UniProtKB/Swiss-Prot annotation:
Quaternary structure note: Component of the pre-66S ribosomal particle.
Subcellular location as annotated: Nucleus, Nucleolus
Chain intervals for the UniProt region annotation (Disordered): 83-114, 414-447
Protein name: Ribosome biogenesis protein NSA1
Keyword rRNA processing: yes
Origin: domain of life: Eukaryota
Keyword check for Lipid metabolism: no
InterPro entries recorded: WD40/YVTN_repeat-like_dom_sf, WD40_repeat_dom_sf, WDR74/Nsa1
Segment forming the signal sequence: none
Biased composition (Basic and acidic residues): 84-107
CDD domains to which the protein is assigned, alphabetical: Nsa1
Family from the record: Belongs to the NSA1 family.
Keyword tags: Nucleus, Ribosome biogenesis, rRNA processing
Length: 447
């Protein structure tokens, strides 16, 4: 397996290569094949750390950093010569050695070259740095989403302030375009529709769910060869309405943390979404059934940090919170009386809750900030500095790797175990034997 994670402490990233069964907390268990620092930039540190990291169509890795920086890296790996003593031995110790690298940065738009001081010990960086876009935001304005628009060959970067920038990565000389979301002043969640890239949903602290069309669906990347700015005028398609007052007749506060679009069994022109909140709720919206959520489930007493679908049918979700919860819930199977509380004025209060299908347990001791579901596996990482990989369905732990750094984002690059050299040699020999046999048969047929 290969997983790329961010390094909050250093502002860089780490590439981890390991097999199923790896566990750095046990000396006699399988250890990682590789843990290597990468994506170092000049003056990289905690204040310029990577918040979001995405795989852009197996062409680039794109990272949104604090301070308004969007960094572009080549997806292809360079062969990197490691000093033997710097390769992690994986003995389960928490003294994670910081590795050094020497990197020559080249900006393709200006052809300027800059030597970066040596901060670790490689001949070159694992992923070549290609370009850096600067977005005009304040240092305190945190990026809350990085989404790709394949049809436009672009990405969208959303910030807490409500600013959303469109960046065309097909031309590194492109000037990022600011998109003005009507009436939006604070964001904590931003999502693009997987099948309608011109449609987005957003929300945040006291910003209830809204759906907007950013541009006409007929627009594609050719627009950037023209006067394109007039083509991007966001308009609101849907505004959600808050749930009814609580049992004390008090207004329920709004604080959306994640948004997902449903794509299965949704009528054209209508939208169905699920959101999580800072107050531990899951809410499902269906625009054909009005502005209020059609379902409102309390699932946690602490803020929900991440939310992803757990299967292709979109009937399960995997979520994490600020404590140590990493769990899978069913959206089809509902426990009607799972949530019970008592109020002096209203008596017993009973609410339905999605069925807890199970927790992912592996000794997690802190908030999980990053997760990805990919090809039947799910990876988690966060404040306790461990990367954990599980089978989504069985929830069996497949690998546990100590990284030595806090993680905000991760990408599963490869879910398969790398074959060892002996296995690779055996396969090469078998292929050569097969080729030789077929070659001899061809010669006999010709005779």
């Amino acid at each position: 397996m290969k997983v790329l994670t961010t390094c909050d402490d250093t502002g860089a990233a780490k590439l981890c290569s390991f097999k199923r069964g790896t566990d750095t907390s046990k000396k006699d268990a399988t250890q990682p094949d590789l843990i290597e620092n990468c994506m170092n930039l000049p003056k990289s540190n905690y204040k310029t750390r990577i918040i979001h990291l995405i795989n852009y169509n197996y062409q680039y890795f794109i990272a949104s950093r604090l301070g308004g920086t969007l960094s572009i890296y080549d997806y292809e790996e360079n062969d990197v010569a490691m000093k033997p003593q710097e390769k992690q031995e994986g003995n389960g110790s928490k003294s994670d050695k910081e590795q050094k690298s020497s990197l020559k940065v080249e900006s393709e738009s200006t052809n300027s070259k800059e030597n970066i001081e040596e901060v670790a010990g490689y001949v070159e960086e694992r992923f070549k740095f290609l370009h850096e876009f600067k977005l005009p935001v304040s240092m305190n304005d945190r990026p809350i989403a990085l989404q790709k628009c394949e049809k436009l060959d672009s990405v969208l970067v959303a910030y807490e302030s409500g600013k959303v920038y469109l960046v065309y990565v097909g031309d590194f000389s492109f000037e990022p375009l600011l998109l003005h979301l009507p009436g939006c002043t604070h964001l904590n969640a931003f999502a693009i529709h997987p099948e309608q890239e011109n449609v987005v949903a957003f929300g945040g602290k006291e910003t209830d769910l809204q759906i907007a069309e950013l541009y006409n669906s007929s627009v594609n990347s050719k627009i950037f060869k023209k006067d394109y700015k007039s083509a991007f005028v966001p308009k609101i398609l849907f505004k959600a309405k808050n749930v009814s007052n609580d049992h004390l007749n008090l207004r329920v506060p709004i604080w959306i943390t994640n948004i997902l679009f449903f794509t299965n069994n949704v009528t054209n022109g209508q939208y169905k979404l699920i959101t999580s909140t800072r107050y531990g709720q899951l809410r499902i919206y269906d625009t054909k059934h009005g502005r209020k959520p059609v379902k409102d489930y309390p699932v946690s007493t602490t803020p929900i940090l991440t939310l992803l679908f757990g299967n292709d049918k979109e009937t399960e979700v995997v979520l994490t919170d600020t404590q140590n919860l990493m769990a899978k819930y069913s959206l089809d199977i509902i426990d009607d009386k799972a949530f019970k509380t008592n109020s002096a004025s209203a008596g017993d209060i009973i609410k339905p809750v999605p069925k807890l299908l199970g927790k992912y347990t592996g000794g997690n001791t802190g908030a999980t900030l990053a997760q990805q579901v990919y090809e039947g596996i799910v990876a988690f990482a966060g404040l306790d500095r461990y990367l954990r990989v599980f089978d989504v369905e069985s929830r069996q732990i497949l690998a546990k790797v100590y990284l030595g750094v806090e993680v905000s984002s991760l990408i599963i690059i490869d879910d398969e175990d790398e074959e060892n050299e002996e296995e690779q040699k055996r396969k090469r020999d078998e292929e050569e034997e097969d080729n030789e046999m077929w070659s001899q048969l061809d010669k006999k047929q010709k005779v």
